[in-house]
């Protein structure tokens, strides 16, 4: 039985892909068979008439996953917009059945699977025949979540609002990770202290441009649940 976790964030460009790659890399370095999946990706680069799923490509390179990164993404769009708008612009109907089928195929190849979301937790994936929000994907795949937040000014507000929304939607939250953390920045230090003292969820950090996570492998494994 595979185990999985979902990576979401307090907003766009917080560092989900960067952290996801480091998580998978850390697990694979100790011979844990960990893979990657993403339901919808926008902003893909076109090379020789082929769209390249940039986030997946980055994760595959950093974590040393073999195979075609595009196979880890159900829907790939060139426009750098929200998935629901990209789908509309390309006349594509996003299907939850396809997402669940693709995820099932991916998880059968690995013992651990790390799923990356799009944007923040409140992200429209499809507004076509099926109305799909990112939260619907998390719940359909029956995954707990890790929340990535920026370490800087404003993160207390953004993080707590994100957590409140997720709890209202009954999405289990395993940890918060403050990205771009600087151990000498008084704002970063205070943000971590406040969140750690006022939440019942573990708070970890990831320094900017780090090639490793300051989280023991044994602890990381605990965040994954059977799926």
Swiss-Prot record:
Keywords noted in UniProt: ATP-binding, Biotin biosynthesis, Cytoplasm, Ligase, Magnesium, Metal-binding, Nucleotide-binding
Binding sites annotated in the UniProt record for ATP: 13-18, 55, 116-119, 179-180
CDD domains: DTBS
Catalytic function, reaction form: (7R,8S)-7,8-diammoniononanoate + CO2 + ATP = (4R,5S)-dethiobiotin + ADP + phosphate + 3 H(+)
GO biological process, one term: biotin biosynthetic process
The protein's required cofactors: Mg(2+)
Positions with a binding annotation for substrate: 42
EC class of the enzyme, as a word: ligase
Residues annotated for Mg(2+) binding in this entry: 17, 55, 116
Location of the active site: 38
Gene Ontology cellular component list: cytosol
UniProt-annotated location(s): Cytoplasm
The EC number(s) this enzyme carries: 6.3.3.3
Annotated InterPro entries: DTB_synth_BioD (IPR004472), P-loop_NTPase (IPR027417)
Lineage top rank: taxon: Bacteria
Pfam families: AAA_26 (PF13500)
Similarity comment: Belongs to the dethiobiotin synthetase family.
Biological function: Catalyzes a mechanistically unusual reaction, the ATP-dependent insertion of CO2 between the N7 and N8 nitrogen atoms of 7,8-diaminopelargonic acid (DAPA, also called 7,8-diammoniononanoate) to form a ureido ring.
Subunit structure: Homodimer.
Protein name: ATP-dependent dethiobiotin synthetase BioD
Gene of this entry: bioD
